[in-house]
Amino acid sequence: MLQHRLLSLVAACLLGSAIATHPGVGRAQDATPAGSPTAGERSTAIVVSATNDPLRVPGSDGVDHLEYDLLVTNAFAAPVTLTSIAVTAPDGETLLHLDADALAGVTQHLLGRTPATEIPASGTVAVVMDVTVPHDRALASLSHQITYEVAPDAPVRSLIGAYAIDGPQLPVDPRPTTIIAPPLRGDGWLANSGCCAAESIHRAIRVPVAGARIGKQEIFAIDFARLRDGKPFSGDGARPEDWFGFGAEVLAVADGTVVAVTDGYPEQTPLQPITGMAKPEDFGGNSVVLEIAPGVYADYAHLQPGSITVAVGEQVTTGQVLGLLGNTGNSSGPHLHFGLIDDPDPMVGNSLPYAFDHWTLQGTFDLDAYDAAGDPDAPPALTLKETPEPQDGTLQLYLDVADLG
C-alpha cells in the first residue's frame, strides 16, 4: 500500500471534531424477519448515534460532500450484521443507499480502517458517511433508515422486536465553508490523505476526547506530498532530502495571529518505523497554529526543525512563510499536514470544512497502480487530465494532484 511504501501518512496532529450526541435510536420500523412485531417503538439490538452534525464542503469533483460518521453499538448478546443504511432528505428523497456490499467498504472499527460490518456483542463500529449533493441543493437535515440482522440461532433472539429503525435525524451544520489560500505553492501536490473517501487515513481517525465523546479529528485535513513523474522521491527515498516536497515553503492561508509554535523535534528517517511518540503532543512534530478568524484555527504539522519563522503573538499576512516542509513527529515521509480546527489545541479541536480560493486540478493518483509499478500490465499511477481544471472555492479531495499556484 502507498500508505506504507509512499508515506504511511498516519494523521500527524490528531485534530478534533465535536460529537453531537443524538440520544435514542428513533422509532422502530417493520421488522424484517417474518412474524416480528411491527407497531410502535420496539426493542432493538443496536443503538445509533453520530460523531457530529453533517459538515458540508464543496469538492473538486463538482458536488458538495456532507461528512459525518454513524456510531452503531450492538447491545445484544450475539454478533449483529448491518445490512443497509439509507439517507433521506426532508422531502423524502433518498440521497444515499448503502447495501451490504457497500457497507463493507465504509464500516470500520473505531480506530483504523479495518472493515467491520459484523458488530461483536457489546461492540461499536463506525460507518463513514459521505453524502453528495449538487452545490445548489439546500438541505436542513438528514434522516436515516437502518436495517440489520442476527443469526437465526442467536441466544435470546426473541428479545429483538425490530430489525429496521429510523434515526438519527441530524441537522446539517449551517456554518459556511471557510475560503482560504493554499498553504503551499507549485504543482504536483498530492492529497495523500484527505476528504472524503473511507479508505483515507484522515477520514478514519476517531479519538475519544475528555471521556465524553468520540472526536473526528481530521475529516478535512490534508497530507500534502509532492510528486515528480508520479513518484514522491528520487532513489530509494531513504533521506528526507530525497523527497520532492522536502524544504518547500509553508505559507499562511489567511491573515491571522500565531497562537502556538512547537519546535525542536528531529527529522524522522523516511520509510522506517516512527520513533519518539511518547505523548499526544509528539504527533505533530514541529508545528504552527494560527487563529485566522474567531474560533477558526489553521494547523500546520511536521515542519523542519529550526525552520519556523514566526513566534506566538505575531501577526501574519496571507502568503507569509511560516516554515519549511519536513518529516518530524508522526511522519514516515516528508509532507505537510494541514487543516482547520475550532480550538487552538489540535488534539481536541473540531475539524472544520474549508476550500482553496484558486487552484488547478492536474489529475488523480492510483494507489493500487503505484503498488503494482513492477507489473508491466499495470496502469500508470498518475493520471493527468488532458486539460487541467481550474478550481475556485473547492476542497482538494483525497488523491487529487494539484497545482496550488
Language-model features and meaning:
Residues 132-178:
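Terminal connector regions
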Residues 173-192, 200-204, 212, 235, ...:
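Acidic, glycine-rich catalytic/binding loops that coordinate metals and/or anionic ligands
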Residues 251, 292, 296-319:
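Short histidine-centered loop motifs in beta-beta connectors
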Residues 256-258, 313-325:
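A structural signal for short beta-strand/turn segments enriched in small hydrophobics and glycine
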Residues 96-138:
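Intrinsically disordered, low-complexity Pro/Gly/Ser/Thr-rich segments with frequent PxxP/GP/PP motifs
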Residues 72-79, 89:
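Asparagine-centered strand-capping/turn motif at beta-strand->loop junctions
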Residues 244-245, 257-304:
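Zn2+-dependent peptidoglycan hydrolase active-site motif and core
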Residues 51-52, 62-69:
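Short, solvent-exposed loop/turn segments enriched in Ser/Thr/Gly
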